[in-house]
Amino acid sequence: MGAVKNCVKILYHKEFAIMEKNELKKLNEEAKKQYDELCKQGLKLDMSRGKPSPAQLDLSLDMLTHCLDGDYMSETGVDCRNYGVLDGIEEAKRLCMPMLGVAHDEIIIGGNSSLQLMYDTMARAMLLGVLGGDKPWGKNEKVKFLCPAPGYDRHFAICQSLGIEMITVPYTPDGPDMDVVEKLVSEDELIKGIWCVPMYSNPEGITCSDETVKRFANLSPKAKDFRIFWDNAYCVHHLTDTPDTLLNLLEEAKKTGKQDMVFMFASTSKISFPGGGLAFIGASAENIKFIKSQMTFQTIGYDKLNQLRHARFFKDFDGIKEHMKKHRALIEPKFKIVLDMLDKEIAPTGF
């Protein structure tokens, strides 16, 4: 770490502008030497964002080996090896409903990716429209979307791939700047929605305040087919004994009669297996009926064996919460090491 500290001091030296050429040359040679020393260590660090460690993946291994044991029938008698059940088996719904805070008729269990669910939801809106809309979004001269920033680049990539104009909304310590959001959506009917990661949003870990959630729920968009894409990816991913809390957007929207404005998403990707978990969408019962009527042309049903594995492994929402404590035990010490080293080695340089 000492070499890294020295490199940082060199890279962020505050007196470059007044140094002589020979001093700069010497400093460059010193930095190159230290860089070469780091390279010689042969470190193979996977810095990919959001990938659980092998130890974290091991936490769910029994799901793959002992959960089914030849019994592939759901509790309602569905053979999960076969076709059918568009919106997910009962026990999978019951497992995932508390993560979003929705009722039985307000959820669809999808495949292995919430990102895919979000993309599909956006694509259907563009091609087919949403509940209450008079035409598909794509039939408008232009489609605009509010994008709180900093935000999730893959959300923005969805917009980019579909030719949707993105409008930046600044973040505050309470979440997206709702003064800006309220003004923009009330003035422009081509603004069809907004992205939001409401809990522990990267990179600052911001969770939307109660007031922010209530203002989301009470938005009055000029577009009658406006939708909030509420990507609650980290709804159970707590690392402290005093976790953040988040109001239930759908329940708040029901109080204002605007529940059809809400699409909520989550998954077990960072709970069980990335790329091998369960993804799900929550919305009003009317929205769910409408979405299912569109989805029926897209799929006969998702992977029910995976749904059954998850339901039997976790058993219930309490099982998920206990499982997340095991993740915390593995992750929290790593956070502490990084933060301690940043404070010790980098902070003294003034950054």
Describe the role of every protein-language-model region.
Residues 54-55, 164, 349-351:
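Conserved PLP-binding catalytic core of the aspartate aminotransferase-like
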Residues 193, 227-228, 263:
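Hydrophobic "anchor" residues on beta-strands that sit immediately upstream
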